[in-house]
């Protein structure tokens, strides 16, 4: 009977304190059906509150657990060498007052940022000059340009961020989502390197 299995560690596992993570939770397994079921239910790690927020499970830990159970299994690994276990705790209910306060702070801050930018580049003078070029008349309040410009500014931000509140305009990720994705990749790489004690060896500890 073929006793070879293929394992690919998942990138991220979400768990709660007290959860027991099995090999099937931490990795995708492919191989003979009975062997696959047996390994999927094999305990690998128990999450506790002392683990705080992040635990790194290394492929060596998985191989060690499998071979302790059955040394005759031929394990072939595919993909990454670590999986990140993110420990989630019960979230506190968000205060309505705090939510409104933060929302107002962000709203006023973003409004001031836009206003200061337009003041720095003298956007009002630009609109006055454009109005005079187009119509041949000077108007210190060129609302004919300022109103469409303001509407276009708002629509442009909606298109740029690809969202209207929670509704996505299309499947294409926004620049902000791409930047957040790249940041998350860098953060995961940092955590995998610094939280995994197996990657660090001090020769003076021998």
Swiss-Prot record:
Q: What sections of the protein cross the membrane?
A: 97-117, 141-161
> Could you tell me which Gene3D superfamilies the record lists for this protein?
eubacterium ventriosum atcc domain
Name a Pfam family for this protein. SporV_AA
Q: Where in the cell is it found?
A: Cell membrane
The alphabetical list of record keywords is: Cell membrane, Membrane, Sporulation, Transmembrane, Transmembrane helix
Identify its membrane topology class: Multi-pass membrane protein
Name listed for the protein in its UniProt record: Stage V sporulation protein AA
The opening ranks of the lineage are: Bacteria, Bacillati, Bacillota, Bacilli, Bacillales
Gene name of the encoded protein = spoVAA
